[in-house]
Amino acid sequence: MQRLAMDLRMLSRELSLYLEHQVRVGFFGSGVGLSLILGFSVAYAFYYLSSIAKKPQLVTGGESFSRFLQDHCPVVTETYYPTVWCWEGRGQTLLRPFITSKPPVQYRNELIKTADGGQISLDWFDNDNSTCYMDASTRPTILLLPGLTGTSKESYILHMIHLSEELGYRCVVFNNRGVAGENLLTPRTYCCANTEDLETVIHHVHSLYPSAPFLAAGVSMGGMLLLNYLGKIGSKTPLMAAATFSVGWNTFACSESLEKPLNWLLFNYYLTTCLQSSVNKHRHMFVKQVDMDHVMKAKSIREFDKRFTSVMFGYQTIDDYYTDASPSPRLKSVGIPVLCLNSVDDVFSPSHAIPIETAKQNPNVALVLTSYGGHIGFLEGIWPRQSTYMDRVFKQFVQAMVEHGHELS
């Protein structure tokens, strides 16, 4: 990202020349306006380069994983230059869904049955045109887990698939029950504490391609689900490695942060309505278990979880559910290489709840902590339409594990 610093310096020089020209033609009428603008520009550039653009903090449980990442995933040690005009966490979080492009992806849908009679929708990108891995049986496979109400249509998922396509890999997106347009066959949705559906999907995908390198990447709640699975199963998983992005490590801390007035207004209430809309489509399936009218009156994610999610999955209290849903305590039991990217200004995942000390005790875990980036933001460049810092971390890490993962054995 040294190029961005050079671009900023070049932009500053061009701005100076432009403003000097405007003074000559009388646009400002005097040199006072020019001096003010130049002074502000220089001060802002200095502040940005000295206080905003920083290298991420890399926390690992051992020298081996740290050296591996420095050698094969150097992006985690490079300076991250957030978008110069939108670097604050909330701004990045709000902007990303609207400004990032959506690369076209043609999916092949598959519905698989579950033990309780339900069904799960998987969206496959087979990448049969791969020239790097022409044999489908050994083509690396990446399982992607979207966020809370996300599907295979999310821009961050599409970008991961686009980058995987460049590497010659195959992708499959795990859509949680009832969110991708498929019928809900049983009165059950999903939560990040219950890993049964994920276990079903992992077993199914691995059975189709047992000889292919198999990795997973989870975003936000998808990352929480993935970490909870890995913490429960340890090394007894067909996955060779995993990556998570913008995970909420402690559900209590996440909820408390999102219930602050500004965060509630910007994020919490909207996501609550999304959750309500998702379950209301299948209202007839839940009327015997929960008071749907009461659920639809929830004003926060915590209220929704108390009235719906915790009840659906048999928890006695919301505190019991949130304790079980938090991946932080299970991090010590993760048995495969996992890279976790978080921003310390993410209001969905407060920095004080990031399990730094726990990560230091597990040689399989690496935390990459940026100073800015928000929640699934990580925008960079002057006009951040294309890939983000998160995308670059994803691409370098999965490629490193596929091509050099044996070095960690």
From Swiss-Prot:
The chain crosses the membrane at residues 26-46. PROSITE patterns: UPF0017. It catalyses: a 1,2-diacyl-sn-glycero-3-phosphocholine + H2O = a 1-acyl-sn-glycero-3-phosphocholine + a fatty acid + H(+); a 1,2-diacyl-sn-glycero-3-phosphocholine + H2O = a 2-acyl-sn-glycero-3-phosphocholine + a fatty acid + H(+); 1-tetradecanoyl-2-(9Z,12Z-octadecadienoyl)-sn-glycero-3-phosphocholine + H2O = 2-(9Z,12Z-octadecadienoyl)-sn-glycero-3-phosphocholine + tetradecanoate + H(+); 1-tetradecanoyl-2-(9Z,12Z-octadecadienoyl)-sn-glycero-3-phosphocholine + H2O = 1-tetradecanoyl-sn-glycero-3-phosphocholine + (9Z,12Z)-octadecadienoate + H(+). Residues 140-233 form the AB hydrolase-1 domain. Keywords: Hydrolase, Lipid metabolism, Membrane, Phospholipid metabolism, Serine esterase, Signal-anchor, Transmembrane, Transmembrane helix. It is found in: Membrane. The keyword Transmembrane applies. Coiled coil: none annotated. Belongs to the AB hydrolase superfamily. AB hydrolase 4 family. GO terms for cellular component: plasma membrane. It holds the Pfam family Abhydrolase_1. GO terms for biological process: medium-chain fatty acid biosynthetic process; medium-chain fatty acid catabolic process; phosphatidylcholine biosynthetic process; phosphatidylcholine metabolic process. This is Phospholipase ABHD3. Its EC number is 3.1.1.32, 3.1.1.4. One of its GO terms (molecular function) is acetylesterase activity. It is an enzyme of class 3 (hydrolase). It is a single-pass type II membrane protein. The keyword Heme does not apply. It comes from Homo sapiens. The gene is ABHD3.
